[in-house]
Swiss-Prot record:
Subunit-structure text: Forms a complex with GatY.
Taxonomic lineage from the root: Bacteria, Pseudomonadati, Pseudomonadota, Gammaproteobacteria, Enterobacterales
Coiled coil in keyword set: no
Record's keyword annotation contains Acyltransferase: no
UniProt name for this protein: D-tagatose-1,6-bisphosphate aldolase subunit GatZ
Keywords (A to Z) from UniProt: Galactitol metabolism
Family that this chain belongs to: Belongs to the GatZ/KbaZ family. GatZ subfamily.
GO biological process, one term: D-tagatose 6-phosphate catabolic process
Cellular component aspect of the GO annotation: plasma membrane
Length: 423
């Protein structure tokens, strides 16, 4: 990470896409995409996905590390080009607890991530606890972030500290996506970004963490990009000019969250304007969902009814029977909720792919289609972009390859934005 930031600060229009997903096919897609490019790949886990208690994935930080390393080994991707990051590391999971116990758990969370070898750490202590006022005083946020940084510094070995980097600040929705529709988005004011930096610098120095300040590479801000279930707010460079200018006076860059579904030109403009770390998550699993749905339509054309996976029906049954991950986010009317379940840009389906019934039905779908020849016309009908790549000879028509390539469509847009010599 330090090399990428140094090159950017030296004037090179370079950035990095942060892949925020625990889905094995998404991770495989990212690693295969840059297998021969020489680029580093940044994969991040969030505190609610992966923590010392298992998170909703059931993985602790060391488990997630081994999970990613296992995929890298299968792909042949070298570990030295793999960066592991932790996103929103702090008390997000324990906001309903008193400050003392929530911070104790947050400190242990940081220690677990650093001990497992994660080298990019987002210190996010912006949430109010059960006994806190709302909103929190910025200095309180900074002091808590400094305590988290102290935990990281005391855990990291000297070798780890060579690679250890921190991201501070937060101006993003609750991790997991917007719960309601958006009509506009507030662009961070440059004076607020400056205040974030100043309060964190003061809090770090008060704990003797002067050396750690040199490891702070980025500040999270809102450059004016967002999405909800049905709409996207696209980047408007002129609205963020003052913010973009301010960061030039620092040794840092910006980290932009919720950059999913922006255009490839917007990614290039964001990187040009010093939002050099672009986070993406739901857009990748949305592409995965599109691929699975497309393959299900092919299965309906090629496989006899009694042999089909019924994957779309299984998804509906599971999500309707177990609505915990989508109920408070989607519209209450049944017909509208079904549209959201299937097609929402926030892609709450992503929480259900590990469900045993859904996983088994996806496996059967792929097995069924592996046993037949996929007609080119059928691929053209349901996956036209992949059909073009088949015609160009850069893709072979297996179900697995079609899924991977569909996810990589998203990554191609980020590569255009993050790599100056890509046309």
């Amino acid at each position: 990470m330090k090399e990428i930031i140094s090159r950017h600060k030296a004037g090179e229009q370079i950035g990095i896409c942060s892949v925020c997903s625990a889905h094995p096919l998404v991770i495989e897609s990212a690693l295969r995409f840059d297998l021969n490019s020489g680029n580093k790949v940044l994969i991040e886990a969030t505190s609610n996905q992966v923590n010392q208690f298992g998170g909703y994935t059931g993985m602790k930080p060391a488990d997630f590390r081994d999970f990613v390393y296992g995929i890298a080994q299968e792909v042949g991707f070298p570990r030295e080009r793999l960066i592991l990051g932790g996103d929103h590391l702090g008390p997000n999971c324990w906001q309903n607890e008193p400050a003392d116990t929530a911070m104790e758990k947050s400190v242990e969370l940081i220690k677990a991530y650093v001990a497992a070898g994660f080298s990019k750490i987002h210190l996010d202590a912006s949430m109010s606890f059960a006994d806190d006022p709302t909103p929190l005083d910025p200095m309180v946020v900074a002091k808590r972030a400094a305590l988290l940084c102290q935990a990281a510094e005391t855990t990291a070995t000297d070798e780890q500290k060579r690679h250890l980097t921190y991201v501070i600040g937060t101006e993003v929705p609750v991790p997991g996506g917007e719960a309601s529709a958006i009509n506009a988005v507030h662009v961070t004011r440059e004076q607020d970004a400056a205040r974030t930096l100043q309060t964190h610098q003061a809090a770090f120095r008060a704990l003797g963490l002067d050396e750690a300040l040199n490891r702070v590479i980025a500040i999270v801000v809102q450059p004016g990009v967002e999405f909800d279930h049905t709409q996207i707010i696209h980047y408007q460079p002129q609205a963020a000019q003052a913010l973009s200018a301010w960061i030039k006076e620092t040794p840092m860059v910006y980290e932009a969250h919720s950059t999913d579904y922006q255009t490839r030109q917007a990614y290039r403009a964001l990187v040009r304007d010093h939002y050099a770390i672009l986070k993406v998550g739901p857009a990748l699993t949305f592409a995965l969902r599109e691929a699975i749905f497309a393959l299900a339509q092919m299965e309906n054309e090629l496989i006899s009814p009694e042999q089909r996976s019924r994957v779309l029906e299984v998804i509906d049954e599971v999500m309707l029977n177990e609505p915990g991950y989508w109920k408070k986010y989607y519209r209450p009317t049944w017909s509208q909720a079904m549209v959201d379940i299937h097609f929402s840009l926030s892609d709450r389906i992503r929480y259900y792919w590990p469900h045993p019934r859904i996983r088994q039905s996806v496996e059967k779908l792929i097995a069924n289609l592996n046993n037949v020849t996929l007609p080119l016309g059928l691929i053209s009908q349901f996956m036209p972009v992949q059909f073009e790549r088949l015609s160009e000879g850069v893709l072979t028509p297996t179900p697995h390859n079609l899924i991977i390539d569909k996810i990589q469509d998203v990554l191609r847009a980020y590569r255009f934005g993050c790599t100056p010599d890509v046309a």
